A protein has these predicted regions:
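Sequence/structural segment immediately N-terminal to covalent heme-attachment motifs in c-type
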Residues: 30-48, 96, 100
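Beta-propeller blade signature
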Residues: 269, 316-328, 395-409
Length: 437
């Protein structure tokens, strides 16, 4: 009995202390926590100010409140839990969804839900987002550095770029699998990837597969059996987007793997160990900048675009070239013609800060004979010309264009605008497949 009493007394004290907590104090803590979680999981689409972007509606203001007052704020909570984050519904605990819900209501000066969450529900207990395993990274013992010649003319058994060859052809010369034996193919191995939205093409070199997962996780696998050799998980800064949107490609060159991250940085990993070699911040993710595609190796320069450029800021959208050895930015080329530029008048009299868009959300291509990097740009933002103080006669260069860029200088050698003055969300930011004729 003495041993039982030893545990009962502290338990009674704990339960009594819980009852003495001030619900208002708990609610204030919830709103603070909700703000932090909103920044991490929601702000990329709905903005840090809750005013929305081209990718997510506004969560603040008269129209938003009137809509959900009619339906009931419980319906807002249910909708958020069932459909958010996109592609990762139910990612958070009930407690986290409630805290985000209360933060949104508080931001609209609306009474928040101060009801207690029932801790008998296991979903109310926050679970760590990281996978806990006993796995320890191993080292790729033998790996020959990837040369420019390899990049430009990859061995038939390797896939060294997003579409195998740097010209974007996406063609494999292998002939073992054909129309006669394809019916006999069988599953050799499978591997569960990290949850989330993904559109990646793995890279393969010397029997090693390099695979990027949602959440900016890169894995090195033995292509013969799927055995994990090493894994790198990018550590996001507080408040950055970690929704796990598409990371369409990574790049490989010499002894490094290159990845463009969700929080607008560029990193290089050691190809044998997966350890971080360098990191370069390209832009501030709090301004909306992010990556959904990665870099291309063009004549020894790591070239990549950026997106998330619908917000009104001075810098606008751009393409950068980086030194593969240390990540140093070699050049930066705007995809928006600014007022002082040669084609600045194609935006009418619009001030520089209001010239938005020109995102590059698909990787580029490269022609080593011409030494030109090709990439497509998306539309001007907002989509409707009149909302930008422009007309459809204002072509808004260099949006909806193909850009041909010297990868060593960043100079736009030539461009072609496919849809001048576009105003109905028809963009051309797709892959550029290069052919000789």
């Amino acid at each position: 009995m003495k041993n039982i009493n030893k545990y009962i007394l502290p338990l009674i004290i704990l339960l009594f202390s819980i009852q003495l907590l001030d619900p208002k104090e708990v609610l204030t803590q919830d709103i603070t926590s909700g703000e932090s979680q909103y920044e991490e999981f929601c702000s990329d689409c709905h903005s840090l100010t809750l005013r929305g972007t081209a990718h997510g509606s506004s969560l603040i203001g008269k129209q938003f409140i009137e809509k959900w007052e009619k339906r009931g704020f419980q319906s807002l909570f249910d909708y958020t839990k069932e459909s958010m984050p996109p592609g990762q519904q139910g990612l958070l605990s009930d407690k986290s969804y409630k805290e985000i819900h209360n933060y949104i209501l508080a931001s609209n000066n609306k009474k928040t839900d101060d009801s207690w969450v029932a801790f008998s529900d296991p979903n109310t207990i926050d679970q760590p987002n990281e996978r806990k395993t006993n796995f320890k990274n191993k080292v790729i013992k033998s790996f020959k550095n990837i040369s420019l010649e390899d990049i430009n003319n990859p061995p038939s058994s390797d896939w060294l770029s997003w579409r195998r060859t740097i010209d974007g052809q996406g063609f494999s010369p292998l002939k073992i699998i054909n129309t006669e034996n394809i019916k006999d193919l069988k599953l050799s191995w499978s591997l569960s990837m990290n949850e989330g939205s993904n559109q990646v093409t793995p890279l393969v070199s010397q029997g090693i597969m390099f695979l990027t997962n949602p959440g900016n996780i890169i894995q090195a696998l033995d292509a013969r059996n799927g055995e994990l050799i090493w894994e790198y998980s990018y550590p996001f800064p507080k408040g950055s987007r970690t929704l796990g949107g598409p990371t369409r490609n990574i790049a490989i060159y010499e002894d490094k793997i290159f990845m463009a991250t969700y929080d607008a940085s560029l990193i290089a990993l050691d190809v044998k160990t997966g350890k971080l070699i360098w990191k370069t911040k390209k832009a501030n993710f709090k301004d909306g900048y992010t990556h959904t595609s990665g870099p291309i190796v063009a004549n020894g320069v790591i070239v990549s675009g950026i997106n998330g450029c619908e917000r009104y800021i001075e810098d606008g959208c751009f393409i950068t070239g980086h030194d593969p050895d240390n990540g140093k930015e070699l050049w930066r080329t705007s995809t928006i013609a600014n007022p002082e530029d040669e084609y600045g008048d194609t935006w009418g009299n619009t001030d520089k800060v209001f010239r938005a868009g020109g995102d590059t959300w698909i990787p580029g291509s490269y022609d080593p004979d011409l030494n030109l990097f090709f990439i497509g740009t998306s539309q001007a933002k907002p989509w409707v010309a009149d909302s930008r103080g422009m007309t459809t006669k204002d072509s808004a260069l260099y949006t909806n264009s193909t850009l041909a860029i010297n990868p060593n200088s960043g100079k736009i050698v030539w461009f072609y605008q496919h849809i001048p003055g576009e105003t109905i969300d028809m963009e051309v930011g797709f892959e550029r497949v290069l052919v000789n004729y």
